[in-house]
Amino acid sequence: VKIHGTNNHQDHAGVGVALPDALQDYRIKKLKEFGVNAYRCSHNPPTPELLDACDRLGMLVIDENRLMGVASTHYEYMKRFMLRDRNHPSIISWSIGNEEWGIEGNIKGARIASTMQAYTKSLDSTRAITAAISGGWREGISNVIDVMGVNYIGQINTDEQHKKFPNQPAWGTEEGSTRATRGIYFDDTKAQVMAAYDKKPIPNFYSIEDGWKYYA
């Protein structure tokens, strides 16, 4: 199965974060119409009703932890949502964290990620572990995680990473222009609008065409 995924926050336009169950179904159905088959929950565990919709409608899921760490509270957070969610067949991976900039690229991050990964596997050994990384390569989390999650691929030399870790799979966990195009026909960085998504908004972001070359 080839992953065609999207990175999604829990809120919905015009509604906020308290979504009725019918809107969970609506969202998953619309994503499937677009050709999407995988849903990354960012940056926290989802409501169970979303996972029910993914199970029912056939959407793969990356279920994500809110905060990395090795204190008892961090373990309790992981345990709580994993025990709640692990019987959902839609879940294909557990994410232990997102963009932990202070520890991504150092030995402290590698140790924390290794410890969290081992703990996660003690609760569920059937799914791969990932973490979404944004810039902290080479010496940290990316060295020890099962599946490397890449946020903003313009920040990493993928050939160098693959050469160093040839057996480590990777997937894109977050990309975005952080701009809007609806009803817009000009570029205005201050207003965060752009004429079209096939343009490169800022240096470390890629246009759609630029980004495709990194994905199989």
Stretch-by-stretch model annotation:
Residues 89-92, 98, 133-154, 166-169:
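Aromatic- and acid-rich polysaccharide-binding/catalytic face
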Residues 66-67, 99-101, 134-135, 153, ...:
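Catalytic metal-binding/acid-base residues of hydrolase active sites
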Residues 7, 47-50, 137-138, 155-159:
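Short, well-ordered alpha-helical microsegments
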Residues 1, 92-94, 113-123, 130, ...:
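Substrate-binding clefts and catalytic carboxylate motifs of secreted carbohydrate-active enzymes
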Residues 25, 75-79, 154-155, 209-213:
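Structural motif corresponding to alpha-helix initiation and N-cap regions
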Residues 57-60, 80-82, 145-149, 187-191:
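Short, hinge-like loop/turn segments at secondary-structure boundaries
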Residues 1-114, 118, 129-130:
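Active-site-adjacent substrate/metal-binding segments within catalytic domains
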Residues 58-66, 146-153, 169-175:
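Short hydrophobic/aromatic-enriched beta-strand-loop microsegments
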